[in-house]
Amino acid sequence: MPAFSLATQEDFKGIRAIWEEQFTTDEPYLSVMFNEIMPLCSSYVCKENGKITSAVSLMPMTFIDSNNGLQLEGWYMFGVATLKEYWGKKLAAQTIEYAASCKENEGCSFIFERPAQQSLNGYYSNLGFTKHLQRIPHLFQVQPEEGSTRNTAETVLKEIRTNFPKRIEWQNIKILEGLLRLEELEYHNVNYCKTPIKEVFISIRTNEEITKEIFNSTFFCFPME
């Protein structure tokens, strides 16, 4: 019988084992993710007989619309995966639902994610991610500060805040620092998604009071696929 729970630091070893099987075995990447970024996120796991079989993680994010004085707290969902030997049991879907329900009970306004491939559009729609936004890649360049060879989290965040009054940004700048070190960032604007079956999109699960129109023309910056 699967059991679902908020992950503890002790669970990271089991989550990492899933990542190594499903995503990457690159040690420098995994070291930054699990030592610097994951402790600042919330992860949820499914266990069977004490073994972690499926996991999902969420980064704390904030939606800001400076022109309208609107600010909403939410999460970016990533790292959804199940050990291959447990495929077919719908454990990932159950873990996603558990994690989303926990965050919604805590009062979060939205959770967004990006299907790794378009064939998963319907999968996430069935899990309540029904507000679809088309991604438009954005060429966003920041000049490093004088004397620096790379962008710092502060310079990137300052540039985003200066140029995009409507945006999603990290609640903890240390997450951004880690992602920059990994060179793991993509930049996008988003518009309404008219044909979600055909378009690559961001999917959002929100509480009932929030419409997808709120997120139209929002600037997104998040980890690369």
What is each model feature region?
Residues 142-225:
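Intrinsically disordered, low-complexity, positively biased terminal segments
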Residues 63, 112-114, 130-147:
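Conserved catalytic-core motifs of GNAT/GCN5-like acyltransferases
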Residues 45, 51-61, 74-81, 112, ...:
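Conserved beta-strand in the GNAT
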Residues 16-35, 166-178:
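Conserved GNAT-fold acetyl-CoA-binding loop/helix
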Residues 96, 103-116:
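Conserved GNAT acetyl-CoA-binding A-motif
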Residues 82, 88-101:
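Conserved acetyl-CoA-binding loop-helix of GNAT-fold acetyltransferases
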Residues 77-87, 225:
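A short, internal acetyl-CoA/4′-phosphopantetheine-binding micro-motif in the GNAT/acyltransferase core
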Residues 123-129:
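Conserved active-site tyrosine of GNAT-family acetyltransferases
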